[in-house]
Amino acid sequence: MLDGASRLNELVARAASDGQPALGMTDHGNMYGVLDFYKECKAQGVKPIIGMEAYQAHEHRSERPSRRGRVDDTGGETEGGGKLYYHLTLLAENNTGYHNLIQLSSRAFLEGYYYQPRLDWDLLSRYSGGIIATSGCLGGHVLQRLLKGDEAGALAAAGRLQEIFGRDNFFIELQDHGIPDQHRTNPLLVDIAKRLDAPLLATNDTHYTHREDHEAHDALLCVQTGSTIAEP
């Protein structure tokens, strides 16, 4: 919550005006907006891709580790050196996948809530059918390992996801928002994709519709994190 600043009608209209045949929505940790998103896409002739940017526990959803330091995109570091949670992009390929996303979202709230609704490897294995997964953004398990210089750990995490979702349904995700960490890790992600024979997927981390909305979105993030616009 307090992350996306787009209004659905404006977002879908922008996609339609750009000639985009499809548009995906992956809200953080929930599927509250799925129905309205689906209806709006259908009304404007854009194919809806339903998904969720899930929060994944480091290992088990029952974990309740102590946090140390500042809150960041992954909730912050734990005393054990891990993260409170990681980001994982999940997309419904078909009706089976849609129903499995509902299961994952619901169980993350009911069984894994700790700062955020978290799922884990066990739930992913049980409800993987009909779902396409990606390695995710800088907050993902794979990239967090790369940012720590742990290329073997990143490869292992990516391999584990590929094993769960299947070779055809797991993608290595690449993003370029001008962020140095992305420039540094994208070649490493390409290498992981080659080693796993996994397909690549280029994405854009969209949180607002128009360029001029960036200041309002910045203020929204400050409300979420308890910081100020003056902070870097």
Predicted features, each with a name:
Residues 1-232:
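Phosphodiester-processing cores and adjacent nucleic acid-binding clamps
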